[in-house]
Structure formats: structure tokens, C-alpha cells
Amino acid sequence: MAVIVPPIKSQGIKTKLVPWINDVIFRSGIDLVNANWIEPFFGTGVVGINSPLGGRRIVGDSNPHVINFYNSIKSGIVTPQSMREYLQREGELLERAGDAGYEHYRLVKDRFNKEHSPFDFIFLSRAGFNGMMRFNRKGEWNIPFCKKPNRFAPAYITKICNQVKAVETVIRQFDWTFCNRSFIETIREARRGDMIYCDPPYYGRYVDYYNGWTEENERELFEALRDTEAHFVLSTWHHNEFRSNDMIDRYWDSSTSLHKNISIMVVVISKTDTL
């Protein structure tokens, strides 16, 4: 089955890992029909959107803009048609704007930082430099323009709208709850027989306003997963050519401290990835 790619673009998206994650779930012995999907670090949503489980989807994220976007699809505010109309209009303004498009990018960025529109969120996600998502200490979008004033060509708009349609279909198919809250609160929703998927921010790597991560956070996550009665899958990074993840040895290699319902996926960051 083809992986559904969500409209939100971000570095580190787990699209290529979805088949691997789902294979772990298939082999876990979990009740695929009735188990609920619990995801406290939803991010772009690519893993949860492609979950093979048939129960409820209860997901959270510390970034309110991610949650607002998905709730806007759920409520019908964001549709393939409304997104197309928005991107066609803003794309034309971007192409005609001064400073090779930067004037309009700045306008949308300033507007988003005040109004938090889910449409502007996708515009910035797609027109920002190198597919990055970063917020400053005030919680404002903090990524420069990709310097492509013709970014929203007709074929690219269609691609994004098709992604909105695919996500809309999955949201209508299942019972979804999207919440802007702490990872601990989301994990507490899990019950015996459910599946928790965790892809937390990476300790020791770049953080921003919404995805800071400390050793204390790592310890809290470890204890929450240790104590849950649900199954869970954890994906994290192991090392690159510059450093290794100290939290692996400190917490996650201690499998005897956990229980039989765990599947840990250690994702090796390649040497070409930046810190």
C-alpha cells in the first residue's frame, strides 16, 4: 500500500520509515481491528495517518499550529478546494511580489504570526527554506524564503491539494482526536491493548520554541512508557559522525527495566544529515 504523504513539509519527516514501523506493529500481535492509536508527538502526521489500526486515533503535539491544521481539516475549514483557491491566489501574489517574491513571503509570515491561519501555515511550510519548520522564542515562524517566486506552480498546487484530500479521507474514516498538550497527557489516554507511537524531539540536537527536549523530558518519557499497560513503539536517533545519543545507553538499552509490550526502533542518522 502506498504511503500517504501529508501536506505539512518538514525536515525529518518519517515517510520512508512508515512501512518499517507498520511491519513492527503487524508483528506485535496487537488487535489490529480494535486497538487505539496513541501518538504524543504527532509532527507532520505521516506515521499516524498511515496507521494500520482500526480503533480511535488520539494524537497530540506541543505545536499548536500542527494541531490547528488537522482540526481544520476535520471541521471542514480546510478542504482540497479551499486550499486550491488559497494557493492559487497567494501563489500569484508571490510570483508578482517585489524582492523576488520575498515581500509577499514576509507579508504571509507576519500575517500567520498574528492570525495563525492553517492556510498560511501550509504556505510557509511549502515556501520556507529547505523544508524546515522553526519558531523563535516568541513562538513566531522563523524560516526564510526558499527564493522560488514561482513556487506554487499548478502541478505543485495539485500535489498539495491531493495530499489534503488523502488526509481528509483518513480523518473521515476514523475517530480522531487532535490535542495541543504535553506528551504525558496524551500517553495517559492509552489503555491495555492500545498502541503508542513515540518519535520525540532528539536530545542534544537543534530545538526551537515548540520542540525543546531535555534529559528530564527523556526521563519522563521513559517512566511513562515503562508504566503504561499499552504496547508502544519508540523511534529515535542513534548517532552520526559527530556525536551519539547518550540517552540510548542511559535509558532505552535497559530493556530489562521495561516490559514485553515494547518495540524500540533506533533510527541511525546518516552522515549527510545536519545537526
Language-model segments: residues:
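Glycine/threonine-rich flexible loop motifs
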Residues: 206-212
